[in-house]
Each structure stands twice: as structure tokens, then as C-alpha cells.
């Protein structure tokens, strides 16, 4: 039997092309994941009684984009704060990685209902470098707008209208206040409402207790389903781990810590562990109770990223000469808002289709009725779309 050398070679080149296509964002994914965990720990450290919810991908994208206009320390600080090691990855590859990532997330045929945007707002007196505007548009599909910050109310209205329009009215009044001396502001938003591959029955949802802490219990609508789930108890994390797929290449991973093990879980989570979970398909029967919730997070990134060492860009010593050559410029305000709805829905018609054979043994009852942590991962790129913690589902 003679190998067909042509065919073999053709196959080889084909796979290498395929790898190239996927390799750029693979290079940035571990950094994004570690950035997600550092940011999460930072927020958890500030308060253990509030919900946490943010989009690592979205924040990192906004600041990688901003780094295009920065120089010197301001520049390296941003990329290092996002967990990139510039001795290991050339900067061009970082931007290529984000470009691929955005391309994947914004595919028009995607069933993922994900809306994300970055708006840069500069005072009308600032003359912006053309190259910066081009890069922002070309690499990051974003826009820079000229506003009159001296008229604070009008500027605020313009920024909020941009976000409201971009999120189809889901996020209103994002910016509550602006300093009079603002010359440069960044807003970054992301909104997601996914559909489960396997929906829950609306009729099964019942009000149940959720134990916020030892002293506090609240009533929440609890979705319930007895079925086959990708769920298991992880000894290393002392937690139940549940993976649930959304239509359109996203997976939610929920972590329910054993009694008193929440902090242990928060400290132990790593990119490698998450990768292992995603590779492991481990279906078993369970009686699942998961709260229905709408969760939002709004963060002043100046404070949050400051704790991760990104401070220069917000200070008078900022070097944003790639944005404007006129006068010294600093970023006065950076706001991030993330919104997620978790409900029973799958595809509208799929309601009655799932008849599952449940094994005879008694399935464990897994109730997410106390604080839990969750991540949402985009399957193709393995990147963390969202990370959060639900301490109190009724918290507005």
C-alpha cells in the first residue's frame, strides 16, 4: 500500500492553517483567565457580602485597545496589569488575539445573545491622532466620540445614550456623575441573555429559601429539574461543580462550595482547573435547584484596576501621546457594566423534547441555595466571558 504523498501533505498544510487560525487567541486566553481571577479576588477582598459580576473579556479588551494610544510606563503597566508578559508574547500578537476573539464573539450567525461595546469619549478640544482612530476601529470595532465635557449634563447624556442604544435599552443611565475637568472617558458594556441547550420547565420553578449568611434568608424563584447533568463533587475545590451549555458555544460553570468552603474555592480556582472541567464530560443524574436571577455589576475601573497596578493612565503622569500629541491627557473615568439574565429558557420550541433515562439509584440533590461562584466560558476560545458570585440573588 503506497501512501499518497500529495494527499498527506495537503492534509498537513490544512491542519496547520487551522491551528494558526486558532492559535492567536490561544496565546491570550491563559492571561485573560488569570486576569479574571486576580480581578475577582480583588473584588471579593473588598467585600464578602456583595454580589460580584463582571466581564473579564470585556474589560481586558477595552484596556488592550486603550494601550494602543499609550507609551512608556503607562503602556507596559496596562499590558502587565492584564497579565501579559511582554517577554513571552509580542505585542502585535496580543492585539491579533483580541481581534480574533472579537471576531468570534460577534459572529452574526451566533445563537449567543451577546452585546458588547467600548466607547471612547474625548473632549472636543482634543485633536486625536488618526492612527489611533484607525486602529481602534480596525482592530477593536470601537469608536471614539468628540463631546463637550464642559457641559457636564450634556456629555453625560451623550455617553448614556450611546450605551442605551448599544444595549437596546437594557442599560440606562450608566454614568451617574462626571467631573468638570474630565477630558477623556471610557465606557465598556456587555449584556448577555443565553438560551440553555436543555431548558428548565417554567412550571417546576417554585419559591424557595436562599441562605445569604447565617442570619439572613431570602425567598427566590428556584428553577428545578431532575435529569442528567454534567455535575460532580470536586475534592480539590470542596465544591459541587456544574457545567451547563448554552446554545451558541458558551458554557456556564457553577461552583457550589461545601459548608464554610467559599474562600477556599475562591483561592483555589485556576485556569488549568477550568480547562480540565471543560474537557471532562461527566453526566450523572441529579436533582438540581438553581435560582433564577438577573445580575448586574457596575464598576469604576479606576479603583478596581488600580489595585492590579494599572494607575499611570489615570494620573497626571499618563503618557497617552498615541491618542493625542497636543497636550498631556489622562483617562478621567472608566466604567464597566455587565448584565446577565439566568432563567428557564432554552429554544422556544424545545420545551417538551427532553425525555431522559434517569438511572434507578437515588440522585443527589444539589441546591444552589447559598452563596456560589460562577464563570461563563466561550467554548471556541475558552475565554472567560463573565465571572461572578451570587451572595444574594435579590440584591439590586
Swiss-Prot record:
InterPro entries, sorted: Serpin_CS, Serpin_dom, Serpin_fam, Serpin_sf, Serpin_sf_1, Serpin_sf_2
Signal peptide (residue range): 1-2
Residues recorded with modification Phosphoserine: 16, 361
Biased composition (Basic and acidic residues): 14-24
Residues annotated as glycosylated: 48, 85, 123, 249
An annotated GO BP: acute-phase response
Subunit annotation: Interacts with CELA2A. Interacts with ERGIC3 and LMAN1/ERGIC53. Interacts with PRSS1/Trypsin.
Domain notes: The reactive center loop (RCL) extends out from the body of the protein and directs binding to the target protease. The protease cleaves the serpin at the reactive site within the RCL, establishing a covalent linkage between the carboxyl group of the serpin reactive site and the serine hydroxyl of the protease. The resulting inactive serpin-protease complex is highly stable.
Family statement drawn from the similarity comment of this UniProt entry: Belongs to the serpin family.
Name under which the protein is recorded: Alpha-1-antitrypsin
Origin species: Chlorocebus aethiops
Gene this chain is encoded by: SERPINA1
Amino acid at each position: 500500500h503506497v501512501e499518497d504523498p500529495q494527499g498527506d501533505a495537503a492534509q498537513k498544510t490544512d491542519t496547520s492553517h487551522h491551528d494558526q487560525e486558532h492559535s492567536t487567541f490561544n496565546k491570550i486566553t491563559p492571561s485573560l483567565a488569570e486576569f479574571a481571577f486576580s480581578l475577582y479576588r480583588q473584588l471579593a477582598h473588598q467585600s464578602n457580602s456583595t454580589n460580584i459580576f463582571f466581564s473579564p473579556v470585556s474589560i481586558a479588551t477595552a484596556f488592550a485597545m486603550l494601550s494602543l494610544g499609550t507609551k512608556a510606563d503607562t503602556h507596559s503597566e496596562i499590558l502587565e496589569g492584564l497579565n501579559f508578559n511582554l517577554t513571552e508574547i509580542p505585542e502585535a500578537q496580543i492585539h491579533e488575539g483580541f481581534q480574533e476573539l472579537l471576531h468570534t464573539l460577534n459572529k452574526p450567525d451566533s445563537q449567543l445573545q451577546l452585546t458588547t461595546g467600548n466607547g471612547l469619549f474625548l473632549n472636543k478640544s482634543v485633536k486625536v491622532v488618526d492612527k489611533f482612530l484607525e486602529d481602534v476601529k480596525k482592530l477593536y470595532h470601537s469608536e471614539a466620540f468628540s463631546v463637550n465635557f464642559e457641559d457636564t449634563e450634556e456629555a453625560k447624556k451623550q455617553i448614556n445614550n450611546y450605551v442605551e442604544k448599544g444595549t437596546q435599552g437594557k442599560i440606562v443611565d450608566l454614568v451617574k456623575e462626571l467631573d468638570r475637568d474630565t477630558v477623556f472617558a471610557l465606557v465598556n458594556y456587555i449584556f448577555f441573555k443565553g438560551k440553555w441547550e436543555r431548558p428548565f420547565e417554567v412550571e417546576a420553578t417554585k419559591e424557595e429559601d436562599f441562605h445569604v449568611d447565617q442570619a439572613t434568608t431570602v425567598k427566590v424563584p428556584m428553577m428545578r429539574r431532575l435529569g442528567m447533568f454534567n455535575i460532580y463533587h470536586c475534592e480539590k475545590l470542596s465544591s459541587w461543580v456544574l457545567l451547563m451549555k448554552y446554545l451558541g458555544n458558551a458554557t456556564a460553570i457553577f461552583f457550589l462550595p461545601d459548608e464554610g468552603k467559599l474562600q477556599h474555592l475562591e483561592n483555589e480556582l485556576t485556569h488549568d482547573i477550568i480547562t480540565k472541567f471543560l474537557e471532562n464530560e461527566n453526566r450523572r443524574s441529579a436533582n438540581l435547584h438553581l435560582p433564577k436571577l438577573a445580575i448586574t455589576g457596575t464598576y469604576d475601573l479606576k479603583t478596581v484596576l488600580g489595585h492590579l497596578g494599572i494607575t499611570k493612565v489615570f494620573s497626571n503622569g499618563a503618557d497617552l501621546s498615541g491618542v493625542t500629541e497636543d497636550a498631556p491627557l489622562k483617562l478621567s473615568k472608566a466604567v464597566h457594566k455587565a448584565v446577565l439574565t439566568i432563567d428557564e429558557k432554552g429554544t422556544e420550541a424545545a420545551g417538551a423534547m427532553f425525555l431522559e433515562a434517569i438511572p434507578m439509584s437515588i440522585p443527589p440533590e444539589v441546591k444552589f441555595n447559598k452563596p456560589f461562584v460562577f464563570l461563563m466560558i466561550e467554548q471556541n476560545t475558552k475565554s472567560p466571558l463573565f465571572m461572578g458570585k451570587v451572595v444574594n440573588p435579590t440584591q439590586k
